[in-house]
């Protein structure tokens, strides 16, 4: 079947509606809050009437039927459908702040309890438990520090690459701001020589020629780059054979400005001919 289906799930307040808007802008026929039990019949019907790209969003309000989703997606794959799964997430403190700012109730907050409505943090923990099986199967996008426009751009970038090949997402980040929740592999490069302590390089980034020249001259940097590249060379085929659509490789240094940026750029250049590759610089891009 000549059809691509994108299924968006995730935590309430994580930005699922924004992601769905990105898909709508990209030409997908989109439906929000689709009951999971209708997924297969909906996809088949929309394929007959609206073309070859369909996107649906589901949330925890359909919790009792969510266990049906993995089986339905497996059935679609057996029919030759290209299925992509995205799971949007954010840290609890960010989700609490978003609910406070919008003054919206959590979908599970009014579930019947003897003591009354559930406290928000308790509700969020329950939601995480209910959605855990879907999270394990999906590409996770951490929206904790993403503005709406950045999330729109990132989703469009993810879906602009062919679905038939593994997509490698290389991401630089600063440990002082925390490790991203969507990383599959995290490499700590804080032990490498730091251009921050070179006065002429401090204001530059790992994309700038003087910083690139400086780091290329450091034997430890070359060794780290080779070790990470060799590790990925060894295991990416196995991940692709295991039907992984996306793999996020996060490289972290102290400030997310020099060393991690340089390594992300070099690794992306190494693998872009073999796999779909995307670059993200969390601190530089304001992500």
UniProtKB/Swiss-Prot annotation:
**This protein's UniProt keywords:** ATP-binding, GTP-binding, Nucleotide-binding
Q: Which residues bind GTP?
A: 59-62
Any GO molecular function: ATP binding
Annotated ATP binding sites: 10-17
Family matches, as SUPFAM superfamilies: P-loop containing nucleoside triphosphate hydrolases (SSF52540)
- Family (UniProt): Belongs to the RapZ-like family.
Concerning HAMAP family, the annotation shows: RapZ_like
Please describe what this protein does: Displays ATPase and GTPase activities.
The entry's protein name is Nucleotide-binding protein Ajs_0902
